[in-house]
Each structure stands twice: as structure tokens, then as C-alpha cells.
């Protein structure tokens, strides 16, 4: 056997062994874990809200580049010309979210929502503006409020290199589609960490019963924060021996950030969308986070309801818009809590081990160990319990 053939055979064997060592990954429902009592949408994703699409560009190059961009489009038209109602809730403001002040002032968004890493946010905004100015119908546009969220992936990525380009932004937007959404180490979640393990992109949705409006709520998260991991009340992080304040010399990464994007087809004003966005943080506490000092935690909610779109130009001084009554908001509040919590957990269950800058490795959550812990605390098989009304 030649030396060259021996080297190739050894490399293939190493690759196979490494692949076998990686646990089978999947979404939490694939392993019998259920959050809440409401049913999911068809794909259990933010794209279950009609018209919403998601596109991603992942950058994994050499030993140091572990980053990307994720694009969420509220509808398939020109969003600058047909804006949608929106609101932002700030859980902890240690972040660089772009576009926030105009959204708070006017209550709408006029671009797709893009997610990336902290130092790339201005470059991504630049690419997003290029995209918007080039859209047919925007030839006279001289002001664009680009919406770009971020988390700091510098633990695995050469963040100072600012590797996401305008071309990557355009490719992510052009790749946007409905249906299932990639999760884990993809797009803006490529280099993120969550609750002591590899984080990433996660998504989930909830469908309300007809008697409660029949509306859909979809959530997409970019997880990059710390704490003490809990799943359905089970102390998973403590059982695994990986949690915040475990030891005097802190190894657990507690700072980071989380971006939460919420879509719904319910007819909501910016006021009620902010109320909806607030409830997403119930999920934060449920999974064991507390919005640390250095965590930039933002929730952006928008409504796709076509009756509430805001034309960029109109001769009408008064708009006819619908807003769900306050007394009918509670089912949506529950839906956003459930979907956010499941999206966070999906981001971790779908993530895989990653080695990045300076040879640093972040392990994925060990699923089989986690399932044993959940079994120990009777936190599995919730699908056998009574659920919400179906009609």
C-alpha cells in the first residue's frame, strides 16, 4: 500500500469516526419534548405566517471565519412602498440594533430585517440600503431605515475581520423562501453560543384555535446568551455541570445577546405589537436566562395583516386600519411565549460542535444526556397531557 493511499485511507477513517461521534441532531419535538399547549403551524417556523420568508448566507472559511447573515422578509412585495406595522421591545439594551428610533417613532418597518454579528452590522446595513435603492419603484428614495440586529460571535469568529459583504447580504435576501427554515449553525447563528453550549438560529410557530381568532404567531431567534439552562423546569445545566456562577473563575459565557423576531397575521397596531414583543421574554426566564449586563436582547414584532399595510405615499389623510381589542390579546401572548421558548431550544438542539478562531471549540448540547435528565424530572412526553381547545 502506497504512503499516499495510506494517508487518504486514514483521513477517510478519521472523518467517519468524527462523524459517528457527533450525536444525531434534531428539533426538540423529534425527541418528544413539547413546550406549551398550543399546536404549531405546518412547518413549526416563522414562515408559517403567510408571506414571511427567510434567507441565509453562512460563512465558514479556514480556521477563523464563522459567521453569516439571516434575512427575514415580511412580504414578497416592495416593503418600502408597503410598510408593515412593527414594534421593538428592549430586554437589555447592550446592543447595536440599527433602525430602532424610527420604528419607535413611526411604528412600522420599511426594509427586511437582517441579523448578523456586532461589528458587521454597519456593513450589512450598507448592503441592505443598496438592495432597497435598487428595487423598482424606489428610484426617488433618499432615506431608508435599515433594520439590522446583531449578536457578538467573537468567541468563534474573527469578528474584527468584518467578513460579511454586501454580496452576502444580497444572496441572503435573494435566497429567502417560505417553508422549513435551516436552524443551528447557519446564517447569523453560525458562530453564536447559548447557555454554555453552541447556539444558533432557531424557529417555531403557534396556531390559535378558530374561536380565539385562528391567528398564527411565528418566531425566529439568534441565540447568543448565558445563564442556567432549564427545559420544561428540569435543571439541565446544573445536572450537566455547565452553568453560570458554577465556579469562582468563571468559564461559562454569560454575556452575548439574543435577537427575537416575531411575525403574526393578527391585525395589530404598533402598540399591541410592543405588548406582544414583551411577552417573548417570559421564554427567556423559562430557559434559564436573565439578560445579563453585557447582553443585547431585543424583540422585534411585526404584523403581516394586509389591511394594516402603510403605503409610502397616499392622498388619504386618514388610514382605515384594524387593531385587535385588548381583551383578545391574551391568546397571542401565550402563543409568543411558547414559540419563543421552543425556538431557543431548537437553536441549541440543531446546533453542532464548532471549532473556530484560536482553535477554540464550543460543544453542542449533548442530546442523549439531556433526554435522560428530562426523563429523571418527568419533563418528557408532555404530548400525552391535555392541550388547548382545537376549535
Language-model features: where?
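Bacterial Sec-dependent N-terminal signal peptides
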Residues: 1-22
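Alpha/propeptide regions of enzymes that mature by internal proteolysis
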Residues: 22-391
Amino acid at each position: 500500500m502506497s504512503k499516499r493511499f495510506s494517508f487518504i485511507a486514514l483521513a477517510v477513517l478519521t472523518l467517519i469516526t468524527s462523524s459517528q461521534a457527533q450525536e444525531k441532531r434534531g428539533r426538540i419535538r423529534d425527541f418528544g419534548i413539547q413546550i406549551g399547549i398550543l399546536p404549531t403551524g405546518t412547518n413549526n417556523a416563522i414562515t408559517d405566517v403567510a408571506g414571511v420568508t427567510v434567507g441565509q448566507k453562512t460563512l465558514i472559511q479556514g480556521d477563523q471565519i464563522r459567521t453569516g447573515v439571516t434575512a427575514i422578509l415580511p412580504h414578497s412585495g416592495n416593503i418600502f412602498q408597503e410598510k408593515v406595522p412593527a414594534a421593538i421591545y428592549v430586554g437589555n439594551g447592550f446592543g447595536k440594533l440599527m433602525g430602532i428610533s424610527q420604528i419607535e417613532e413611526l411604528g412600522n418597518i420599511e426594509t427586511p430585517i437582517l441579523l448578523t454579528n456586532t461589528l458587521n452590522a454597519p456593513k450589512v446595513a450598507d448592503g441592505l440600503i443598496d438592495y432597497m435603492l435598487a428595487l423598482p419603484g424606489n428610484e426617488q428614495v433618499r432615506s431608508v431605515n435599515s433594520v439590522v440586529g446583531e449578536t457578538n460571535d467573537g468567541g468563534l469568529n474573527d469578528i474584527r475581520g468584518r467578513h460579511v459583504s454586501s454580496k452576502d447580504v444580497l444572496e441572503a435576501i435573494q435566497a429567502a423562501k417560505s417553508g422549513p427554515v435551516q436552524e443551528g449553525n447557519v446564517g447569523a447563528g453560525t458562530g453564536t453560543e447559548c447557555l454554555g453550549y453552541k447556539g444558533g438560529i432557531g424557529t417555531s410557530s403557534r396556531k390559535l384555535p378558530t374561536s380565539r381568532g385562528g391567528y398564527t404567531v411565528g418566531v425566529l431567534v439568534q441565540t447568543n446568551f448565558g445563564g442556567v439552562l432549564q427545559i420544561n423546569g428540569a435543571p439541565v445545566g446544573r445536572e450537566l455541570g455547565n452553568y453560570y456562577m458554577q465556579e469562582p473563575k468563571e468559564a461559562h459565557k454569560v454575556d452575548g445577546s439574543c435577537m427575537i423576531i416575531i411575525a403574526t397575521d393578527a391585525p395589530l397596531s404598533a402598540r399591541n405589537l410592543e405588548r406582544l414583543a414583551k411577552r417573548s421574554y417570559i421564554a427567556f426566564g423559562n430557559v434559564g436566562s436573565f439578560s445579563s449586563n453585557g447582553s443585547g436582547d431585543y424583540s422585534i414584532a411585526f404584523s403581516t395583516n394586509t389591511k394594516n399595510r402603510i403605503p409610502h405615499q397616499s392622498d388619504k389623510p386618514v388610514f382605515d386600519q384594524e387593531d385587535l381589542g385588548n381583551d383578545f390579546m391574551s391568546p397571542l401572548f401565550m402563543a409568543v411565549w411558547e414559540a419563543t421558548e421552543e425556538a431557543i431550544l431548537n437553536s441549541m438542539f440543531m446546533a453542532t460542535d464548532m471549532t473556530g478562531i484560536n482553535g477554540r471549540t464550543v460543544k453542542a448540547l449533548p442530546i442523549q444526556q439531556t433526554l435522560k435528565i428530562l426523563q429523571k424530572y418527568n419533563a418528557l412526553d408532555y404530548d400525552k397531557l391535555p392541550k388547548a381547545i382545537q376549535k
